[in-house]
């Protein structure tokens, strides 16, 4: 008779006060925030990746401190500034971007000021994780959460560790920071999820190309990136971060994201460093209908923090982590804090994205709009790219709405 070790027959149960699933920008930032601010309890972070932090599926673009100051509300800007100053050290900046080229249907429509940084996201995340560990957090990479359930006013998650196999972690507070859809949300049914038209399938790769080293490029062409846009972000050494964002409701109809990506690289003279193309699903429908329930919370992409008009994800994820951390440290309400600080911007950006959707999905409509008023089109795109909360931007979109419907 084969006698199995007790560890195999009886899953090991680890106990913690806070379990954070996902070690990306949101999860790592929250772990660091809690332990640095003397949270009363153990903080454990797990991530399915075996390497801290790879692979990177991201444009890796962050705003300079002053870029968004005129465009967003003061309280939100204060949180953004905190996330930048606490995480973005000089050694993580790969390249300084000065301008943005906006290409619409193969033509350069405008070149606008765009003080941003191309960063080494992997190095930035590794540093945040290391700081979290130094402050007292427990971190386990190579550990995948399989399912989580409520149990005796706490939560129990079955996880799989590449070295130890399956075991359970018991926790008082559980946080889903594992992108969309989160295993926490799937297990506990916290949100209603997002409709296909509110999701983007984004590709990511690095490529050689003959483009200015201080100019980011976004390409809005519904034949190339229906419902989204393509991007070329220079790293400063002749290599560029590139990708295509395609709306999920059309991504697999007749074509697929990889085909769109290949056409994009061919048309814009880009030669990839590797043949492989990474992909991920990104929510662009604004914040989820709920952010948590009964000490189970969602942050980052899991709660829908990606900016709907530009796909920015790193700092918005950290903003949600900061707000949850603040609520846990000070005993305030995470939902109320999110609704006050972050939701107004997200709701406004969803509105702008939906107003522009008919153009993003129809090349001929995009052409007609450019012929009618290229100046209004370009300024609206630029404002939306900067997440503008200015009244003038709202007026542009409200005035443009009936015109867009008419020409579409």
Spans of features found by a protein language model:
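C-terminal helical "tail/cap" subdomain of flavin- and related membrane-associated enzymes
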Residues: 326-408
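A short, basic/flexible loop-to-alpha-helix module at the beginning of a structural domain
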Residues: 2-15
